[in-house]
């Protein structure tokens, strides 16, 4: 009788939060019990460790066989260019990842041989998802006699009513930038139907295009108009995004447009709910800003086919329905879209967010963080949104500045 071969591989992940780490430890324990020939040596790292330190470890021969890799040109793109990651297309076909996840999720982990982001071979799969949606305080809406808005005009009407009744309509914290740029991106992408998403995809993935989009111009105009009408929480310019979230949690405004990373924080306030971003008129399936966490990849350190095959088995488990249930039990949003997932009964807010996620991905509606477009776009967005809301910049000037940032980046890539 021939003994089964054993495989050992090391794994790097960034799940340092206690509940996240417990979920991963349980997943590894279950997986290795089901595959007794496989041993996984887990190591938890910071986000920054997945960048230059990971590359140095892989080039020196001391790196992990499986690692979470940050998407984008400076990280995954650089590792692909240096042939430090293995393509996963054969495994994606074997395990059904291409049917389990929509293109809008998998594209984020694709790189072509010409270093085109968003196309070509698949180099990773993510386990957690995230999106920016509409949080609302039902008690405050009920007090004002307002139904949950489904469209952008309904949201604007609701905010006008709330303002008239002395209830701050929309929480915003602009001090550290992110919440402002995410609101602008949300107002832009809610004007884009998923059936017409290709130009935005091309823009974000560096294929080409322009920010000179009338829908972005309209979004910037809406944002400035809301400010002038007093819909934002007073003093928002001096409030950070986490402080803004805490103010909303404490009932200081009726609405907050922000991400699912606040689900755990808001869980204790039963008046807080999560909904789809109200869509613009004439849009059937609007995009919602979002993405995934870092992708699980197989590195050049997996020297044998057996190691790579076993690593792929593990990655398949990490993105499986079973793992999705572990994430949900821990209070996090899985990237998978299992309609029969086991959602904790004591967490209705998480259930609302997960149902929104499932519906969104059913029509391929997961949009983009606009700052992905160029290495400098995050700074450009933050600065221009602050100037826009200080009435020191017109919507047209904002659009022109974003487009200039993009055009300069494309020139640096020598792409038309």
Regions found by a protein language model. Give the residues of each.
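Conserved N-terminal structural module of periplasmic/extracytoplasmic solute-binding proteins
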Residues: 1-84, 94-95, 99-100, 148, ...
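Extracytoplasmic/periplasmic substrate-recognition and gating elements
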Residues: 33, 60, 120-121, 144, ...
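Short helix-initiation/N-cap motifs at beta->coil->alpha
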Residues: 44-53, 152-157, 235-249
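Hinge/lid segment of periplasmic solute-binding proteins
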Residues: 73-132, 182-183, 273-275
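Short, solvent-exposed loop/beta-turn-alpha elements that line the ligand-binding surface or hinge
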Residues: 89-104, 191-218, 279-288, 342-345
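Extracytoplasmic/periplasmic solute-binding protein
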Residues: 114-127, 132, 156-208, 253
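Glycine-centered hinge/linker elements that transmit conformational signals in sensory
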Residues: 159-161, 202-236
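C-terminal capping/gating helix-and-loop segments adjacent to ligand/active sites or protein-protein/ligand interfaces
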Residues: 205, 333-337, 353-407
